[in-house]
């Protein structure tokens, strides 16, 4: 009889928490754990009920146009293949353009009776590595996907652009060193900042002044197509310190 009552009392008696859950009053998600939850451990994970606050589209730092996100790995591969096909088409088109120009120059030389050596100009080598051209195209696309470039092409049409006055996209097909190309891209993007939208009130952004930067290309006949553009800052001669008043004051004191 006593064993029967002991069994009933043990069934209704609350079980003590397991050895692995002693002293743990909260679950892994921070919520209070129930008293009858004996199997819960810190390794239990529950999916978050709140969805990730991640936008469906993103823009480049200076762009107002939404760019579709890459949904999966297949989309990234397809986009890369499309870029390669476009690069191959651009290379073929540029080669045809060079051949047409060369044929036109030969026709003009033959009609005028001049020799080839008289009109021999140094032409730069053509970049034929698809990987290099693809990398350059990505850098150009990044610079063109900005508000400043959109404002520039609207304000200055192609037929009104002048050399050494308006920014010109570097030629991705010419043979440049990596350092020279990166410098040209950087200076091109700096020049595009002239068409940035006006800064809003309270913003820390400073307007880009054309007087602060002068872009020049230092090149020689030997490295005509491998020269590195340099950045030269203007120095106003009017701000030079005048020593003449100091000499006059020294003579008066002596």
UniProtKB/Swiss-Prot annotation:
Identify the residue span(s) of motif Nuclear localization signal NLS2: 95-98
Keyword set for this entry? Answer: Cytoplasm, mRNA processing, Nucleus, Phosphoprotein, RNA-binding
Question: Region entry Mediates interaction with mif4gd: which residue ranges?
Answer: 68-123
> Between which residues do disulfide bridges form?
none
The protein's location, in the record's own words, is:
Nucleus; Cytoplasm
UniProt record, GO biological process: cap-dependent translational initiation; mRNA 3'-end processing by stem-loop binding and cleavage; mRNA transport
Gene Ontology terms for molecular function: histone pre-mRNA stem-loop binding; mRNA binding
What kind of modification does the protein receive after translation? Answer: Phosphorylated on Thr-60 during mitosis.
A Gene Ontology cellular component where this protein is annotated is:
cytoplasm
Disordered, as annotated region: 1-88, 105-133
Task: Write out the ranges of the annotated region (RNA-binding).
Answer: 127-196
UniProt keyword annotation of Cell wall biogenesis/degradation present: no
Q: Which residues carry this modification: Phosphothreonine?
A: 60
Q: Where is the composition biased (Basic and acidic residues)?
A: 1-14, 26-38, 62-72, 116-126
Short motif (Nuclear localization signal NLS1): ranges: 24-27
Its annotated function is as follows:
Binds the stem-loop structure of replication-dependent histone pre-mRNAs and contributes to efficient 3' end processing by stabilizing the complex between histone pre-mRNA and U7 small nuclear ribonucleoprotein (snRNP). Could play an important role in targeting mature histone mRNA from the nucleus to the cytoplasm and to the translation machinery. Stabilizes mature histone mRNA and could be involved in cell-cycle regulation of histone gene expression.
Q: Belongs to which family?
A: Belongs to the SLBP family.
Q: How does it assemble?
A: Interacts with mif4gd.
Q: What is this protein called?
A: Histone RNA hairpin-binding protein
Q: Which organism is it from?
A: Xenopus laevis (African clawed frog)
């Amino acid at each position: 009889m006593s064993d029967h009552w002991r069994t009933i009392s043990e069934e209704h008696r609350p079980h003590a928490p397991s050895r692995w859950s002693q002293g743990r009053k909260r679950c892994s998600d921070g919520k209070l754990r129930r008293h009858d939850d004996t199997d819960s451990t810190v390794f239990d994970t529950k999916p978050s009920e709140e969805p990730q606050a991640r936008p469906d589209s993103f823009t480049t730092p200076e762009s107002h146009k939404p760019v579709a996100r890459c949904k999966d790995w297949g989309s990234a591969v397809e986009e890369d293949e499309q870029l390669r096909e476009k690069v191959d088409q651009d290379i073929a088109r540029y080669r045809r353009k060079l051949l047409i120009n060369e044929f036109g120059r030969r026709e003009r030389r033959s009609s005028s009776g001049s020799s080839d050596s008289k009109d021999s100009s140094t032409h730069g080598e053509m970049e034929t590595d698809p990987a290099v051209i693809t990398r350059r195209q990505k850098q150009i696309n990044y610079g063109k996907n900005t508000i400043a470039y959109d404002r520039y092409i609207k304000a200055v049409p192609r037929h009104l652009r002048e050399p050494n006055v308006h920014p010109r996209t570097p030629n991705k097909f010419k043979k440049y060193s990596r350092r020279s190309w990166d410098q040209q891209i950087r200076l091109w993007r700096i020049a595009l900042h002239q068409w940035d939208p006006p800064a809003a009130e309270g913003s820390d952004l400073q307007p880009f002044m054309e007087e602060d930067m002068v872009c020049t290309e230092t090149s020689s006949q030997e490295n005509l197509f491998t020269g590195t553009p340099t950045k030269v800052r203007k120095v106003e001669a009017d701000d030079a310190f005048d020593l003449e008043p100091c000499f006059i004051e020294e003579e008066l004191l002596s």
